[in-house]
Curated annotation (Swiss-Prot):
Signal peptide range in chain numbering: none
Taxonomic lineage: Bacteria, Bacillati, Bacillota, Bacilli, Bacillales
Gene Ontology BP annotations: glycogen biosynthetic process
Protein's name in the database: 1,4-alpha-glucan branching enzyme GlgB
Region (Disordered): 619-645
Species per Swiss-Prot/TrEMBL record: Bacillus mycoides (strain KBAB4)
Amino acid sequence: MDVINCEEVKRDEFHTEKYYDSYNIFGAHIVTEDGMRGVRCTVWAPHAKAMSVVGDFNEWDYEQHKMLQVTEEGIWSLFVPHIEENEIYKYAIETMDGDVILKADPYAVYAEVRPNTASVVFDIEGYEWNDKNWIRKRKKKSIYKEAMTVYELHFGSWKKKEDGALYSYREMAEELIPYVVEHQFTHIEIMPLVEHPYDRSWGYQGTGYYAATSRFGTPHDLMYFVDECHKYGIGVILDWVPGHFCKDAHGLYLFDGTPTYEYKDRDVQENLVWGTVNFDLGKREVRNFLISNALFWMKYFHIDGFRVDAVANMLYWNKEGKEQSNEHAVSFLRELNEAVFAEDEEFLMTAEDSTAWPLVTAPTYEGGLGFNYKWNMGWMNDVLKYMECAPEYRKYIHEKMTFSLIYAHSENFILPLSHDEVVHGKKSLLNKMPGDYWDKFAQLRLLYGYFFTHPGKKLLFMGGEFGQFDEWKDLEDLDWNLHDFEMHRNMHDYFKELIALYKRSKPLWQLDHSPEGFQWIDANNNEQSIFSFIRQGDKQEDALVVVCNFTKATYENYKVGVPDFEYYNEILNSDSAQYGGSGQVNKKRLKTILEPYHNQAAHVEITIPPFGVSILRPVKTRKGSKKQDGSKTKVRSNVTSRGKR
């Protein structure tokens, strides 16, 4: 780390200007000064009366290592000689009221294992990376026109040892990576790994933003994990929470006895949703802390993306009973994204946002927030409500399955089947499905078929791939014993085949962010709850026809309008017996009938299985074939894609 002596920094630079490598000033850095080895400790505490560095090295004596105030705005610093790596320490802060409080270092890169709360001196440098090829290849790809399948997981509950102990970062590399590779996920998304005191906050209520949690090992161990992911072609996305933080006494809350990192105004300071406090995003020092933190994770841990948590909670605050936009947060998010993309244009910045705020994924120079992806929470909520409805009543809420296509290309979307939907009494995805045992599995296969063929990149929370019956239990690992049961094994096989089909089928992702990539065949068959549509790639022959049946009825010789190719093959049927279905499949090549149907030039007659999805691929095109309206077979639109920056 390029340690900068705080006395060399312009007096007001950190307080008034964009300073995105503030981690080089603040924190505890192993250095040699005047020929003596030790640690330089620097911290910002604007309302402290006095400060000391304390730890085992001085028996936690507040009087021994007094810090010097080097700026009027509250930067304090001290060189502590003769202490080395792995020394524990805190800051003893005398408040304006005369009390002395102990605080962990906001910029510490390592911390004690909970329940202990001290910071730990650690040299973040020294890890030898082996991922140059990965980084080079990633930066050459356009993330918008590639397949993206994200496996969301909680590090502490994906799998545990027989005695219930947690796997370390290095052990997880051995356990998790082969599993992810087998399933052909392109990325993993890990719930927050910043240091946090309470296991059941899942990392979303942090105290040490620069410290990879010591529950699983050292920062270098996490670097090894990321390096191994890159070795096997897996991108790593981290959940990151720049909106709020916890109130634990050793953390950022009332850091110098007064609101420092949080808003001073209690009306906007308190985050009533989670019992936390909101970052004061209008304060330059706080912005520098957070944006430096994002760039720190990029630089030192080589991560490939952030999922920015609770953006909706940042964009709006409830002040005096009225919902108002938070202009501090809006400008912060724009500044954050500009800083990130200045470092890496192909980095993933995903907003978890449930609002209708416009232009979330538009560049800031076009008036947008500057993210390149947004979770499609509306799609998730509508689809899951539809699936939870009894099949015979789905015809009355038919629009929940079609509404998302009205706005599907207004942003660059990721479709999330995330952890939030399988916890706190919401049931697992499998158990959300109505009906008996067979019905549940059939409908989950159907849901996944619709999920992988709908425009948007894909995200699935751990356990969904094999049909976890119980909802997520964060203190236990997944129910791996379910593989002893045939239907779960069949579900797992189906999911792996579906994701493999998705990755090798350009129509399912090449034009995700363009209206040209999707066309309804029939969106209006609410009586039978059958939906059919076309997914289109760049080339005319890159087209797939998808038919989804959301009831248990079976239909023979069902007419489906199709582009005029000579034949179609069914390349996937969720009702196949090998996946646990009833076997109502279309084994033979389907010859098109040159009679217009569904505003297409031709049609095929197929068997539609119960609770089934059927995917058809054209085999051969007729010369000069056209649709009924006289246009070329290939699906096209004059609307410009927003999948660009």
